[in-house]
From Swiss-Prot:
Induction of its expression: Is constitutively expressed.
Gene: glsA
Organism lineage: Bacteria, Pseudomonadati, Bacteroidota, Bacteroidia, Bacteroidales
Gene Ontology MF terms in the entry: acyltransferase activity
Organism: Bacteroides thetaiotaomicron (strain ATCC 29148 / DSM 2079 / JCM 5827 / CCUG 10774 / NCTC 10582 / VPI-5482 / E50)
Protein name in UniProt: Lyso-glycine lipid O-acyltransferase
Function: Is involved in the production of glycine lipids (GL), which are phosphorus-free membrane lipids important for fitness during growth of the human gut bacterium B.thetaiotaomicron in vivo and in vitro. Catalyzes the second step of GL biosynthesis, i.e. the O-acylation of the hydroxyl group of lyso-glycine lipids, resulting in the production of the mature diacylated glycine lipids.
Length: 272
């Protein structure tokens, strides 16, 4: 693969492509600010330096770049055989995904897959570990097939059922509603579910921004633009990952709806 195929962040190009008519009216200082908060230069240097690393090796390079360390609890709860669905809270939006994939990837010899936004497929090193999903646009009709392919594979599945990273509500930092997909698909594929708790939090600025946008009725996820900045704020830290006991897929019977079972598992995660 040549260097030409390497994905690099280019804020100017993104703005020209996504907003061609408005681009010439965007002040240069705004473009410079966006480059700063997404850490364009630093991340591009890393992507270039790690361009030959794939899969779990790429995640390890990410861990080193972020100087992230992980303390693992409940390692005895990780099954040696069988296929499972690992579901975790999503406090950070960066280190949590990287660290969880790294820990499980090393434990299961690289046989792990994330269900992720298809935009992350642009990261060449991460792509081999991803099942791309897109609920909007032309690919929306293929969403069920994409999810099905992941669960029918011989890889361990890693999911963040909230989709978005945690928000602060009534003073408590916690995931928003967990989607029921992991319950339905785990039953169909007869995969037990392993609850995972990842310790960590973003800055007060991030939570305040998300809440202000919500209060103003702004639908665009502005807080998402700051996730790279939050990732850099969380460098040089040690995070605790706790694995709970596997929950047999037969547990998820008709006594609750899939959405209620998803909430049930979420509650278990926050008690770990």
């Amino acid at each position: 693969m040549t260097d030409d195929s390497l994905f690099l962040i280019d804020v100017d190009k993104i703005l020209r492509t996504k907003a061609p008519k408005q681009y010439k009216y965007i002040p240069k200082f705004v473009v410079s600010y966006l480059k700063k908060i997404v850490h364009q230069d630093e991340i591009n240097v890393f992507l270039n330096e790690s361009k030959d690393k794939l899969g779990v090796d790429f995640l390890e390079a990410c861990m080193e770049f972020l100087d992230a360390k992980v303390e693992v609890k409940g390692i005895e709860n990780l099954p040696k055989e069988g296929l499972y669905t690992f579901v975790s809270n999503h406090p950070l939006g960066g280190q949590d995904g990287v660290a969880l994939g790294y820990v499980l990837g090393r434990h299961y010899d690289g046989k792990v897959k994330y269900l992720v936004n298809d935009l992350l497929m642009n990261l060449r090193g991460l792509a081999p570990l991803c099942v791309p999903i897109n609920k909007t646009g032309k690919q929306a009709k293929d969403f069920p097939k994409m999810v099905e392919a992941g669960f029918q594979s011989d890889d361990q599945m890693i999911m963040f059922p909230a989709g978005l990273c945690s928000r602060r509500q009534n003073g408590v930092i916690r995931d928003l509603e967990w989607k029921k997909t992991f319950i339905i698909k785990s039953i169909q594929a007869k995969r037990d579910v392993v609850p995972v708790h990842f310790g960590g939090r973003n800055s007060d600025f991030f939570y305040n921004l998300a809440n202000v946008c919500k209060a103003l009725g702004i639908k665009f996820n502005i807080a998402m633009l700051y996730l790279a900045d939050e990732m850099f704020k969380n460098r040089h830290k040690t995070f605790t990952v706790t694995f709970g006991k596997p929950i047999p897929w037969q547990t998820f019977d008709k006594s609750k709806t899939p959405a209620q079972w998803a909430e049930y598992v979420k509650d278990i995660v926050y008690k770990l």
